[in-house]
Amino acid sequence: MAGERRDSKAAAFFCLAWALCLALPGFPQHVGGREDRADWTQEKYSHRPTILNATSILQVTSQTNVNRMWQNDLHPILIERYPGSPGSYAVRQHIKHRLQGLQAGWLVEEDTFQSHTPYGYRTFSNIISTLNPLAKRHLVVACHYDSKYFLPQLDGKVFVGATDSAVPCAMMLELARSLDRQLSFLKQSSLPPKADLSLKLIFFDGEEAFVRWSPSDSLYGSRSLAQKMASTPHPPGARNTNQIQGIDLFVLLDLIGARNPVFPVYFLNTARWFGRLEAIEQSLHDLGLLNNYSSERQYFRSNIRRYPVEDDHIPFLRRGVPILHLIPSPFPRVWHTMEDNEENLDKPTIDNISKILQVFVLEYLNLG
């Protein structure tokens, strides 16, 4: 997760300004020198979820298994994986293999590019997994899979970034696996509105700074992909709309896995979607589906607001994409230390947040 400048008030104000000016519905956006936009690009602002009832929630949560996720997805990712390292390649192959093996039929693409870093030119590779590339609109769930680069330690320890962001990666893979049946149905649906709304999972490379957080040494993968999507016509063959405009909502996961996280509201224009997370959390609690949980330690807190922090959403925010940033405040105490490892993860918390996210995704995609 992003670096040393994230607590800067100036950076926070800059991000907030973008949030208020660019991300608000109806703010003019220029595509090919024109301001006119197809009606479908406005549908995100009036989109309504299908609220799951208790029976559906019980069914969804019964499909997920945190122990299986831990063994099959988290352990393979809990290795040193800074850009260009052998671990980075291994994790990338694991993510692609897991998604390609699902029945839903994901289109899994590797977006590889080179960028200048403090250590010279490095190769980066984002992973983009799209359920239905022909759908006009996509809910995006994203995280970064790289780990921060540290010089070799005298004690031989390496930084594995458990919360930052191995756990979010594993949660996204578990979401795709446990919801495979429902997502297969969505993929096969040929009737609107389901045919025009789908899911995209993005795993960014190069989120972390190599040396010191700066506009040029950070967010390598998200900066590159946002620029690429802004210049790629969407739907295919379109002349006035692009892939950026096809993003309904950009949900970014980061620093998840420590006990008792508090997620505040960072962007007011997506507060209604944050409210759904809060409501889902309460519903799961009422149904007795959250483990080692106390309502006094609520995760999603709409009564708490914080200035935005710099992360992979920034290049998309600057292009007018609505952002739902799921990052705790304060950060976990192990942030950017060698202690951000498996030993300091809290399995019940991860299981609980994973369930909440899965219900949220189904509701957003109207798969109730």
Curated annotation (Swiss-Prot):
Disulfide bond entries: 143-169
Active site feature: 207, 254
EC number(s) reported in the record: 2.3.2.5
GO BP of this protein: peptidyl-pyroglutamic acid biosynthetic process, using glutaminyl-peptide cyclotransferase
GO molecular function, a single term: glutaminyl-peptide cyclotransferase activity
Name of the protein described by the UniProt record: Glutaminyl-peptide cyclotransferase
Tree of life domain: Eukaryota
One GO cellular component term noted in the UniProt record for this chain: extracellular region
UniProtKB keywords: Acyltransferase, Disulfide bond, Glycoprotein, Metal-binding, Secreted, Signal, Transferase, Zinc
UniProt note on tissues of expression: Expressed by the venom gland.
